[in-house]
Structures are given as C-alpha cells and as structure tokens.
Amino acid sequence: MAKKASRAKKQVEEESGVEFVTDVPSWFRRERGRILNKGNLPESGECVVYWMIRDVRSVDNWALLYARHLAAKYNQPLMVLYVLPPPPSTTETVDEDVPPLQTSQKMTLRHGDFLLGGLQCVHKELNSLNIPMHVLQPDNVEVAQMVQDFITNQKASTCVVDYSPLRHVVGWLEQLTSVKIPVIQVDAHNIVPVWHASSKREVGARTLRPKLHKLLPDFLTDFPTLSPNTNKSSTPNINWGECHSYLQMDTSVPSINEICPPGNEAAMNQFTSFLSKGLSKFDELRNDPNYRHVCSNMSPYINHGQVSFQRLAWEVKHLRKHPLGTAAFLEEGIVRRELSDNYVHYTPNDYDTLQGAAQWAQDSLELHSTDEREYLYTTRQLQRGETHDDLWNASQHQLVQEGTLHGFVRTHQIQKNTFWNIFYRILLQHFFLM
C-alpha cells in the first residue's frame, strides 16, 4: 500500500513538472512546497532566510512556518526579509486620452500606507518572537541581486520564499537560483497549491471546481502556532519614515487607513463583524449593492496578504451556521479566487494583455471594434466620474474616496467602460490605472 502511494505521489510530480519538498513535519503537506534550487547541504550555514513577498503576515503563513521548521531542524535562527518595491525609474503624466503604462505608475499613498502599516504590524509581532525582520530598499540594484547579497552576507543555509505568479517575481526567482543554497517556494496564498490543483490553465470555475473540491479535505486544515527563535538574534531597527519616502508615492490618492486599518488583527476584527452581520444573508443579498453590510470587505486584507483565506475558510466552515451563506462565501473565496492564480500561473507572458483572454472573447472584441459609440470619454473624465451615467459616476467617486467598490457595481463599471472606448489596448490601461 505504501509503495502504491509513493508511486502515485511520484506520478503527480512528474505530471506537474514540480519537485516537492521531502523534509516536512506532520502538519505540512509536502505539495505546498516546491524546490527551485537544490544547492549545497544546508547544515553548513548560519541562518534560514524567509523572503516575504506576497504574504505579509506573521500568523497562518505556511511559508513562514516551514522556514521556522527548517531553522529549528538545523538549530539556526530564522530571519525574515522584505524588499520594498522599487519606484518606477520614469513616470508619465496622465494624458487626457491615454493613461500611463503600468510600469511607469507610482504606488499610490493609499496602497503604500496600507502596505507599510501591515509591515509594521508584522515587524512588531515577529519582534515579540525574537525573529528579526529586515526591510530593504533597492537603490540602483536589481531586487534579486540585493536578495542574493543579503543571503550571502548572512551566510544563509536555506532561502524560503512565498508564491506569486506575477512576471517580475518569477524573474527575480529565476535569477536567485544561481545561489549555492536550497531555494524553496511555498504557496501560502492558495489553500490548494496552484501547481498541485491543476497542471494546466483551466477553462473556468466549472473545470477547476471539482479538482479543488477533491483536494480540499487534505489541504483545508488548521495552522500550527509559530514558535519563537530559540537562538539569540539581533533585531534591526527600521526607519519607517525612510521607507515611506523611498516609495515616492502618488499622494493624489489619499490613505484610508483610518477607515480600513492594516494588519492581521484588524482583518480578523472585520471578519468577525461579517460573521455576525453578513454571513446569514450572504447567499441571498451579496449581489445587491443596496446591502453593503452583507459583504465581507475582506478583499484589501486578502489581496495584500495580511490575512490567509484558509484561516477564514476554516473558521466559517467550523462555525456550522448559515450553510447557504457559507457555501457561497467559500465558492467565491476558494474556487473563484484560486482560479485567478491558475490563470496567471499558466499564462505568464500574456495575463495582462488581450492575448491572454479566451479566443471567443478576443473574437467578440474584434467583431465589435468598429461599432459606433454613442459616448466616448477621456481618461480624466473617467477618473473624475464625469460621464452621463449616474451609477457609474457614483461608484467611481466611492472608489476614490473609500477605496472600495461592490462587486456587482464593479462589473457595471467594466461593462460600460468597454462601451465607451474604441481602443481595447487603452481600455486595459484604464482598468489598471483605476
């Protein structure tokens, strides 16, 4: 029986092209981690480094937990590294008709303040566990090179990194494989690791859903508690004011941290409120923008990695109340959310272009590209909510002022914006900007 199970596991790895980690504790599914670089024997180093990229939290973080496991095994301290995203080298002003490219857009104050606020929470929490956290600012140095230098200077034995499917992160990790130590990537964002859920890009939710549901009993588990460093470690001081200045943020989009405070504790407070006020009606009223209190409002925390959706799914499932609301919440948070990672993971070159869309969608856009438009609006008009559509304008104003938008209204915005634009390439830039 054991040999049969071993052969089955080997077959899964061969089909997916992924080499899973082998040295795992009982609470860790080996499929969560994949080996990017084997390197030398890790026992010869002086620490284990966890490079935090996407999952900015100290709790319910499989990548951090696995890194701590390795540190304990090798009797070495754990260090956490975060590299601030470099500001664009060149910036473009917003043209009346053509929005700037993504690569030249500054981080907004809204995103930057939320990011830094979350990092400060993580730094404080790790400090209480005697786990040092370093926040680096790349200056005329490639991010991957800075991480490689950090690993070398700290004499790291192993580098653990969390998972992101985005192109620039994939590029960093490809450069990092030149180091002579093991580099292990752990998917701490998806409940079922993206490379294990499916070996191909799925058509849609209907094809991914059965695959996820088959695997969920093994992967939707509780988390162990992160143990403190037992080895003495010096905790570096972080100048958060310097970090703020380094990001060179676009201050035209104000912070909303007072409305939506960052950090895992704030996220769980919001989730507790949703369980008591929204879950019972979530199935029935979640698509009605008149009932905003029914929505969870967890998207900022999930998207910024400040809370694990696996924690939310575990808690709502074990609440054992409101089965219809629970089913709808899990469908959106597991199937629909993990479908997006599947799309980006298996469409690495085109996920942010029209070429990444399904062929029928491309054909439809091409067919209607010459249709007469009753209304056409510039980038400025759309940003300011100056259209003939009162609902569209109101939703844009809400997005600017509150940083949130109901899912049904978001769909309305996208549909109308498609009607009001001739050039679909520019249309995508509109969406990225707004």
Show the residue positions of the predicted features:
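Trp/Phe/Arg-rich N-terminal binding region typifying the photolyase-homology
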Residues: 1-230, 325, 397, 416-421, ...
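Short, hydrophobic/aromatic alpha-helical segments in well-folded domains
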Residues: 66, 146, 270, 297, ...
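Glycine/tryptophan-enriched, flexible segments
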Residues: 2-5, 12-15, 27-28, 43-45, ...
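Acidic/polar loop patches that form or flank catalytic/metal-binding clefts of enzymes
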Residues: 341-342, 407, 425
